[in-house]
């Protein structure tokens, strides 16, 4: 301890001494030693004053006219992330073969071959002697992440419209094309996977021409996997995609494209600078939350975070604050940021909207002791995904848990995978359900996300004017030979046909209005089964409609099992009721008394199964001729069972719920 105090005194004396006076020990502190004890803010300022690197000098020398911001529009699994890797290799951003799916950071993205979070990467490309700054934004392809897709498109000036040569145009290609078209992006047709034996580039080009009315003469045919013709894409990007419009002399205007959480830096924002410039030390304000932040660092993704002294109009990069933004809920996708004092000089960028949860599940730990771990795991994942809604709830059967809201079924499935892979959570998940709107006689409206809140008693039903459920406009693409089966599936799920179009001799685009509740009930799995995996699906919200929905309950010896209840359409009740009681019977152990399993809506029983009790042979020691004694013992056994059934609790193991709730 005495030695430590002496060292501290020596350091303190050294820092206070004049530089001319020699130090009392051999080690001489550098002139800027006081920075070792400086605050984070001064450290950020010091970072900003560092001399620019060779990379930064090249970037600063490039005018906005030689910027190109682009993304890749594609259906799931058409090779978007692989093509991104090839472009990064060709521009020298990464070493050839050094990584795969560089822009897919999550384990679940690499395993499923999908993109969940929007990512970006900056590339430098020399074309005809001039340096060009290319910003590639890798966007999710699935409908559940449409908010991230549309915000990413808003930060771009053009897009590569990527189509698989063997599969052709698919549902999400169509949906994402219209999103890109609505943003006014310049589209470059690209046919991928031309090296496959099943590839038919000519058919894919015809589909693009007839479906999107694009000039396919300039289309580029590539194989992202082998690198075939990918080098032709870079000159095409430079020549066909326009430069971003912006002025670095105007007041700062920044679009928030995405965000992620860092343990040390807090929330890091992915931004597109539309006007002005931003650097460390600037104070920014959010139009959505009105909160103010001091910039700690700005930089580009090259492909990892690479600090820069400034981000100028037209650039896509990252920013984090000091002190850091601690809550990801403050980072709202589509929000506009500007410098403090410029709020009245800048109009917020259009298109900002809060993401709405449309699919809800309940999550419970398999063991009650794991609840704190589950809560901590969910909170950590929420740091990177602000679109999930969380509410604590309790079930008599399963204990404490959470009601979670997601953008869609894939979003829910990805979240569940991340809970298990990244945090080792062992959980029970209820089947997905959708919100229900209640219009009361008083004129009020209530959106119900949990079956517990559904007004199913007679007194409550009297106060209800009507129930409504959400509908979606569904776009399905598939080979024409499956048309009859697909129409039958849609009609069987309460669908209403909107349009039918043959966009090639063999492919059909079918549009249906469907209840969202039917869509989340494994509709896509049934569609894939009917079409042997050749169908694709996309959907968009289509408002609320009046509906005859009821709360279906599961009763065990007349006691409701709250964790299993669901709000369903009246037409599904007979099928689901019978399915429930039959399946639940398989997983409940026999008891010493009779167990009655029932499915009910209100006071009406719609299905029933019975589990017989264990039978004790009370007549084993009796003589065959003792009839009165026989009757007496059987009557006493019968009364005992009734009494046991009245006071006994049915023991239902967690594994029974796990098996029942699994598909």
Swiss-Prot record:
In the UniProt record, does the keyword Transcription occur? no
In the record, biological process GO terms are: positive regulation of translation; translation
A GO CC annotation recorded here is: mitochondrial inner membrane
Alphabetically ordered keywords of this record:
GTP-binding, Hydrolase, Membrane, Mitochondrion, Mitochondrion inner membrane, Nucleotide-binding, Protein biosynthesis, Transit peptide
User: Does the record bear Cytoplasm in its keywords?
Assistant: no
Residue stretch of the organelle transit peptide: 1-37
Q: Which CDD domains match?
A: EF4_II (cd03699), EF4_III (cd16260), LepA (cd01890), lepA_C (cd03709)
Q: Where in the cell is it found?
A: Mitochondrion inner membrane
Q: How does it sit in the membrane?
A: Peripheral membrane protein
- In terms of domain of life, where is this protein from? Eukaryota
Q: Which Pfam families match?
A: EFG_C, GTP_EFTU, GTP_EFTU_D2, LepA_C
Q: Which GO terms describe its molecular function?
A: GTP binding; GTPase activity; mitochondrial ribosome binding
Q: So what family is this one in? A: Belongs to the TRAFAC class translation factor GTPase superfamily. Classic translation factor GTPase family. LepA subfamily.
Q: State the protein's purpose.
A: Promotes mitochondrial protein synthesis. May act as a fidelity factor of the translation reaction, by catalyzing a one-codon backward translocation of tRNAs on improperly translocated ribosomes. Binds to mitochondrial ribosomes in a GTP-dependent manner.
* Protein name per its UniProtKB record: Translation factor GUF1, mitochondrial
Q: What organism does this protein naturally occur in?
A: Uncinocarpus reesii (strain UAMH 1704)
The primary gene name is GUF1
């Amino acid at each position: 301890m005495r030695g430590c105090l002496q060292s501290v005194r020596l350091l303190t004396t050294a820092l206070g001494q004049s530089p001319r006076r020699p130090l009392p020990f051999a080690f001489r502190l550098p002139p800027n030693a006081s920075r070792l004890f400086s605050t984070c803010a001064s450290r950020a300022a010091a970072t900003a004053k560092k001399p620019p690197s060779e990379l930064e000098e090249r970037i600063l020398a490039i005018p906005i006219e030689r910027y190109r911001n682009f993304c890749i529009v594609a259906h799931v699994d058409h090779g978007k992330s692989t093509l991104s890797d090839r472009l990064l290799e060709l521009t020298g951003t990464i070493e050839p073969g050094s990584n795969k799916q560089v822009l897919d950071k999550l384990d679940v993205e690499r395993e499923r071959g999908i993109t969940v979070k929007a990512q970006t990467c900056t590339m430098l490309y020399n074309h005809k002697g001039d340096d060009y700054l290319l910003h590639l934004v890798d966007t999710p392809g699935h409908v559940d992440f449409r908010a991230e897709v549309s915000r990413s498109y808003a930060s771009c000036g053009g897009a590569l419209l990527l189509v698989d040569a063997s599969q052709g145009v698919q549902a999400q290609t169509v949906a994402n094309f219209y999103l890109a078209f609505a943003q006014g992006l310049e589209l470059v047709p690209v046919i991928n996977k031309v090296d496959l034996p099943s590839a038919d580039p000519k058919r894919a080009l015809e589909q693009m021409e007839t479906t999107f009315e694009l000039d396919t003469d300039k289309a580029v045919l590539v194989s992202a996997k082998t690198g075939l013709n990918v080098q032709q894409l870079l000159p095409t990007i430079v020549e066909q995609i326009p430069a971003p419009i912006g002025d670095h002399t105007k007041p700062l205007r920044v679009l928030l494209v995405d965000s992620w959480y860092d343990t040390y830096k807090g929330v890091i924002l992915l931004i597109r600078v539309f006007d002005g410039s931003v650097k460390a030390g600037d104070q920014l304000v959010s139009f959505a939350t009105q909160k103010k932040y001091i910039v700690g660092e700005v930089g580009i993704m090259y492909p990892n975070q690479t600090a820069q002294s400034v981000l100028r109009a037209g650039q896509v990069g990252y920013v984090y604050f000091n002190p850091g933004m601690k809550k990801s809920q403050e980072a709202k996708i589509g929000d506009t940021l500007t410098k403090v004092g410029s709020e009245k000089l800048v109009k917020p960028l259009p298109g900002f909207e809060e993401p709405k949860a449309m699919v809800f599940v309940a999550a419970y730990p398999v063991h009650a002791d794991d609840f704190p771990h589950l809560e901590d795991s969910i909170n950590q994942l929420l740091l990177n995904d602000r679109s999930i809604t969380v509410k604590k709830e309790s079930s008599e059967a399963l204990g404490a848990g959470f009601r979670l809201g997601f953008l869609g079924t894939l979003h829910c499935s990805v979240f569940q995978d991340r809970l298990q892979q990244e945090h080792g959570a062992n959980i029970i998940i209820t089947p997905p359900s959708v919100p229900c709107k209640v219009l009361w006689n008083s004129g009020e409206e209530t959106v119900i996300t949990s079956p517990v809140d559904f007004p199913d008693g007679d007194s409550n039903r009297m106060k209800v004017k009507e129930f409504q459920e959400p509908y979606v406009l569904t776009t399905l693409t598939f080979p024409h030979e499956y048309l009859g089966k697909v129409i039958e599936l849609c009609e069987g799920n309460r669908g209403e046909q909107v349009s039918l179009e043959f966009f090639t001799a063999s492919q059909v685009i079918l549009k249906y209005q469907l209840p969202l509740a039917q869509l989340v009930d494994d509709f896509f799995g049934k569609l894939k089964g009917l079409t042997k995996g050749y169908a694709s699906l996309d959907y968009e919200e289509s408002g609320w409609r009046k509906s005859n929905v009821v709360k279906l309950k599961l009763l065990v010896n007349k006691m409701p099992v709250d964790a299993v209840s669901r709000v369903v359409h009246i037409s599904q009740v007979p099928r689901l009721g019978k399915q429930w009681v039959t399946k639940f019977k398989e997983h409940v152990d026999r008891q010493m008394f009779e167990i009655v399993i029932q499915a009910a809506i209100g006071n009406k029983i719609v299905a029933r199964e019975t589990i017989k009790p264990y039978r004790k042979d009370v007549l084993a020691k009796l003589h065959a001729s003792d009839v009165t004694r026989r009757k007496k013992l059987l009557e006493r056994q019968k009364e005992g069972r009734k009494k046991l059934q009245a006071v006994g609790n049915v023991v239902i193991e967690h594994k029974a719920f796990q098996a029942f709730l699994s598909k």
